[in-house]
Amino acid sequence: ALPGSSRASWLTEPAVAEALRAQRKELFGVLEAEDAERHTDYARTLTVFLQHGGQLVQTAEALGIHRHTARSRIARIQELCGIDLSDPATFAEAFFAATAEV
């Protein structure tokens, strides 16, 4: 990002933005469906987890839940989505997808 810019300019390129929207729909669609069916809070949990750089304690504090609950939710999110958020590339992909404009 340029000085004074809050976002990397390449993220707004049409092809990149479209790819991120598609990834967001795929990733969060699964979680939103689970949330609707089971009254969970997985989509919000993942968003907060990504916003806090994968830090469970900070995520738990932001959500007002115990860190073990946050850990359990992240484990279930990874299972539902078939992803491993401990992998830096996967984490980055999820992070950028979460920031995509819908």
Predicted regions located by residue number:
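Cytosolic nucleotide-utilizing catalytic cores of signal-transduction proteins
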Residues: 1-102
